[in-house]
């Protein structure tokens, strides 16, 4: 895939970025260079290579996936003007 001047101008317009003619011409070369590098990366054989999250092997820290109320209901509603059994009471807004 290659980028031409019209594509650069269209993307700049969609992104609402003011780009002069000189800048647009320079960006054509830069974007084509980036896309060329990405195409080179797609040629690399990565079959059998395990995905990495870091350059050093480490286990991800995980917490237990448990649903709790946080045991802080009283603290949460402490500053509310009106509550009932740890629920906020608000005025009725729909008839």
UniProtKB/Swiss-Prot annotation:
The keyword Nucleotide-binding applies. GO terms for molecular function: asparaginyl-tRNA synthase (glutamine-hydrolyzing) activity; ATP binding; glutaminyl-tRNA synthase (glutamine-hydrolyzing) activity. It comes from the Bacteria. Keywords: ATP-binding, Ligase, Nucleotide-binding, Protein biosynthesis. It catalyses: L-glutamyl-tRNA(Gln) + L-glutamine + ATP + H2O = L-glutaminyl-tRNA(Gln) + L-glutamate + ADP + phosphate + H(+); L-aspartyl-tRNA(Asn) + L-glutamine + ATP + H2O = L-asparaginyl-tRNA(Asn) + L-glutamate + ADP + phosphate + 2 H(+). Heterotrimer of A, B and C subunits. This is Aspartyl/glutamyl-tRNA(Asn/Gln) amidotransferase subunit C.
């Amino acid at each position: 895939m290659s980028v031409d001047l019209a594509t650069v101008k269209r993307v700049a317009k969609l992104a609402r970025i003011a780009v002069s003619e000189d800048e647009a011409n320079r960006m054509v070369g830069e974007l084509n260079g980036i896309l060329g590098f990405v195409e080179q990366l797609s040629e690399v054989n990565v079959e059998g290579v395990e995905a990495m999250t870091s350059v050093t092997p480490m286990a991800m820290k995980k917490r237990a996936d448990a649903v709790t109320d946080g045991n802080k209901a009283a603290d949460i509603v402490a500053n509310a003007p009106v509550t009932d059994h740890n629920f906020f009471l608000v005025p009725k807004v729909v008839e």
